[in-house]
């Protein structure tokens, strides 16, 4: 348990993780954990497979992390939303990524509702950063902007608001 706990502490000290993400990483076999690059000894030429991690021990480590407030899905969701929105992603993509990371749907919805991000303004900034201050007006170029913003995870209404505000 001590090895698993120290692994969890190391992972959580680097960044926040969701419970499902931490559980998956703890259950995974460490890839050549003791090996160093360039130091090949005769005994390390054929690494021995390690025994699978006991799920009960993982549960104990997860409970210990919750007990010490090291693991918190709500905090993870808030920080993840802030991080991804600063990188220019929209709410739809962030929601999808959080679901893939194992964050509960209701928790994701609540975190997105609590964040104070103006997604229309965010979409406008992303479009201007990619296509310049003068957004295209012809249909073909507008479609290119729209596809790009949809890929980045913005909703259709947010994209249309850019052109409504741009026209005024």
Curated annotation (Swiss-Prot):
One of its GO terms (cellular component) is cytoplasm. Belongs to the RecX family. The gene is recX. The keyword Ion transport does not apply. Transmembrane segments: none annotated. It comes from Serratia proteamaculans (strain 568). Gene3D superfamilies: Winged helix-like DNA-binding domain superfamily/Winged helix DNA-binding domain (1.10.10.10). Modulates RecA activity. InterPro entries: RecX_HTH_1st, RecX_HTH_2nd, RecX_HTH_3rd, Regulatory_RecX, WH-like_DNA-bd_sf. HAMAP family: RecX. GO terms for biological process: regulation of DNA repair. Its main location: cytoplasm. Keywords: Cytoplasm. Pfam families: RecX_HTH1 (PF21982), RecX_HTH2 (PF02631), RecX_HTH3 (PF21981). It comes from the Bacteria. This is Regulatory protein RecX. NCBIfam families: PRK00117.1-3. It is found in: Cytoplasm.
């Amino acid at each position: 348990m001590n090895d698993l706990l120290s692994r969890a502490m190391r992972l959580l000290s680097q960044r926040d993780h969701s419970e499902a993400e931490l559980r998956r990483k703890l259950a995974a076999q460490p890839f050549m954990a003791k090996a160093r690059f360039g130091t090949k000894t005769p005994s390390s030429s054929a690494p021995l497979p390690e025994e699978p991690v006991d799920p009960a021990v993982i549960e104990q480590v997860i409970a210990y992390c919750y007990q010490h407030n090291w693991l918190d899905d709500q905090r993870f969701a808030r920080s993840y939303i802030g991080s991804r929105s600063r990188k220019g992603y929209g709410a739809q993509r962030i929601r999808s990524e959080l679901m893939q990371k194992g964050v509960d749907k209701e928790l994701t919805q609540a975190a997105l509702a609590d964040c104070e991000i103006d997604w229309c303004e965010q979409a406008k900034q992303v479009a201007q950063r990619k296509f310049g201050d003068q957004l295209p007006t012809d249909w073909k170029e507008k479609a290119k902007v729209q596809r790009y913003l949809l890929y980045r995870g913005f909703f259709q209404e947010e994209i249309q608001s850019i052109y409504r505000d741009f026209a005024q």
